[in-house]
Amino acid sequence: MKGMAVTRRRFLQTAAALSASVPLHGFGAALTGSTASREPLRQFDYEQVQITGGPFGEQYNAIHKHYLELSNDNLLKVYRQRAGLPAPGEDMGGWYDLNGFVPGHSLGQYISGLARIGASTGDQACHTKVHELVDGFAQTLGPKNESILRPDTNLWICYILDKHFAGMVDASTLSHVSSAKEIANRVLAGAQPLLPAKGRDRIGKKDPPYDETFVMPETLFAAGELTGNPAFQEIAHRYLLDRELFDPLARNDDPFPGQHAYSHAIALSSGAAAYLRGGDVKYKRALENAFTRLTTEQQFSSGGWGPNETFITPHKGELYAALSSTVDHFETPCGSYAATKLARYLMRMTPEPADTRYGDNLERVLYNTILAVRFPDEEGDYPYYSTYSPTAEKVYYQKKWPCCSGTLVQTVADYPLNLYFQTSDGLYVNQYMPSRLQFHHNGAAMEIVQETAFPSEDTVTLRLHTTQPRAFAMRLRIPSWTSGAAILVNGKPLSTRATSGTFVTIQRNWSDGDRVELRLPQQFRTEAIDELYPETIALMRGPVQYVALQPEAGLEKERLRLPAGLKQVGPQRFVDTYEGRDVTFVPLYSVRTERYTTYFSKA
């Protein structure tokens, strides 16, 4: 997916075609219905937003290509083997094989991710692959509708079912696979005898028995809406972790220490789904309190959390201790999936956000965790943990096709959802990256094109194309990390002050060719790892964490004059000189296979 120069002629030529082929919604129409008060901000559809360049576009394109090239026969082989059908293709190894840790576990996630990418890009090859995988999967279910490859162990039933249902929901709604609804019903029917009576919690990384029901209610609610089958909703309510998670969080108690980090963070999405569908404000309070605890007590400067996949006990210096006790600091594709979903849900549930906390943390997580992972290879090697120890490296997980191979494609495929939100009277611009948004408003086809080299540069330009002038409010996120932000509309300064940590509203009658220019100065700052070790610091510039590239051993112990000693030597490349030696600092996301150090000692 390459960036496209947008001209008024091209827009006017394609507006009619877009109207017919892409479901572009108006602001008011998107917010009708009984849930409008619970969801004052709404996501745009995948079809309405495209990533058109920049580092996120590069990664998006690579992930698009990688998953599209996975062999259908390889992916379906374990299911065909279990069904006694001819099973061409190669064994995939690792977690995925019939004798692996969780056989065939991630097929539904691959289907889901490809459907989402296909919806945003319009790539028919993605939809074709989704159709083929769904059809192949359906052929293996047999008369008993068996989708669990090792039912005799009674382990990971919900873990796998959740992925099956996610795949069928997205295959139906995004790739228009007509059979996916009935397949979801068949999968549920076949699995009923295996389902636990209630959600089984897990603590830390203890051995089974337990099951992964944490995000399953979110998926079950969606499957219930898709199929009209009330059994999905009944099980969804049964699996909500009210006693263990949502009730204490709603009281602002802390249930996190010692718990498996990703499982409980992703479970918050189930609470969001319960709130949006049922309206119980307990779940909304729980998510708000959880976000505060995760971002102020649990996270590293990258936005990651959960060393050794376990939430720490706050205020005891455990994040600092983890820098030397482990190299497994954040379960990155899975954890970033949970963190980005949580931030988006809270954006959607918050009327007229008074500050930018959700968008700011979403930005931090995007740049320093999921964008910063190593690209997968063709052999089933995937990123899993991020390491924040001295002289770290980005390495693959020791087993092929792990859980993160599924959440990687889903998280990246969701990039378009992070950028813009709609309200009854306009839209929010929530993230800054090259992109295109298409929508209708009061009968006019509209397109907003975002052009920027951010964060390499400080400026963002939004160009509007429309078939007819229309009035609406455009709200721009002014991040809390910036100072001295400035906004121009058609070359003239906006009279409203661009205050850090707020959304600035531009209310006007928008015409074709209107242009908004935003400048977000990025300055270096340092952040302490926790309150007990304030001299151990990370280096931040804007939303981006900077690391020392190819550092000498022991650099983390030297007292550097950060950020005062930094001198720029290239785009996003800075040097500090210590005892006659140059130390180079670059964004964590730009590191590929080089060694790096993330935390330093304050001079």
Feature roles, as predicted:
Residues 2, 10-30:
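N-terminal export signals
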Residues 30-106, 124-148, 178, 185, ...:
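Low-complexity, Ser/Thr/Pro/Gly-enriched N-terminal "stalk/linker" regions
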Residues 39, 46, 53, 118-131, ...:
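Structural helix-adjacent loops and short alpha-helical linkers that scaffold large soluble proteins
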Residues 71, 75-99, 139-155, 190-210, ...:
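Glycine- and aromatic-rich loop/turn segments at beta-sheet edges
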Residues 99-119, 156-173, 208-225, 259-276, ...:
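Well-ordered alpha-helical segments within folded domains of soluble proteins
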Residues 223-246, 264-302, 335-338, 342-346:
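Active-site neighborhood of glycoside hydrolase catalytic domains
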Residues 236, 287, 359-463, 499, ...:
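C-terminal beta-rich recognition modules with glycine/proline-rich loops and embedded aromatic residues
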Residues 482-507, 526-532:
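Solvent-exposed beta-strand/loop surfaces of large extracellular or lumenal domains
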